Amino acid sequence: MQHVRNKTTLPKINALAAFYLITLLPIGWPVLGVAEELTGSALIVGNGPERYAIEALAKNFEAFHPKTSLDFFWHQNARPVEEVRENGADIAVTGQAEKDLPSTTVAWDGIAVVTNFSNAIEDITREQLAKIFSGEIRFWSQVYEEGPEARISLIHRTWNQNIRQPFEKFLGFENHKGIRAKIVEKENETFKAINGDIYSISYVSMGPALQARKDGYGVTLLFVDDIEPEYQTVLDGTYPLRRPVVFVMNGNASPVAQAFLEYVLSPQGQRAIKIGASGLFQDKTSSVIKYYPLDGE
């Protein structure tokens, strides 16, 4: 598995192996219909928060197929689906299916709504979120009875992180524009922004949010429609804010890419997703970033 190169052009497939993941214990995996001596490579492109989880899965896959190489290009300005369409990559990791390309949901991710810990709010409704992020509600006093007469500080996410689109779809206004808000890219930048503004509100991937709370960040994960944001509620689908993690495949994807998809969908791959990717999160602290398997177990 190769270094992720933070450039806006695709790397060649012969880069060095990624070094920043703490090794997951390999989990036994049957061959799933592919030759034991599987050889070759595949290029995976993405730009969202799924990076470490997918790389951990790739590390497991390569352990059982040592003559293969799963290479990554992961950058904020990457265009995963476009690269697949242009035959520049085998797999695009995205947050939605594409009608014209083979698309498979491989896991789920919750989206946590976060506020500053000093803000007394604990729960919020979908309707309130929609009014806040559309600008109809502008003050915390309009959200809850004890709320201060203070303007709400909106912190939006960039369009290329697979988070904003499903969040706005949940609120019922895809591609909504015209609301003034601070824009942040990475999860840890969001936590820092929330920490620095008592009246702020934003949304992040559930795994990093749960880890941030565990690590002592001053953030509150709000109940949404009376459902607690936690691993089990995302897993069983009762928590309303969740999004798919999708593999969009090149129609001419390499045998290695196809075998990797089979592995991720296998019981062993889904178990690895449930365990979580042990690695270095974006703020360089040790963490466990979990996604949610498909079977709900």
Sequence positions of predicted segments:
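Bacterial N-terminal signal peptides
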Residues: 17-30
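N-terminal secretory signal peptides that target proteins for export/translocation
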Residues: 1-12
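Exported/periplasmic ABC-transporter solute-binding proteins
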Residues: 33-78, 82-86, 92-109, 114-297
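Composition-driven detection of intrinsically disordered, low-complexity segments
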Residues: 12, 17, 288-289
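Compositionally biased, intrinsically disordered low-complexity regions enriched in proline and serine
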Residues: 3-4, 20-21, 204, 292-293
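Intrinsic disorder/low-complexity segments
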Residues: 5, 16-19, 43
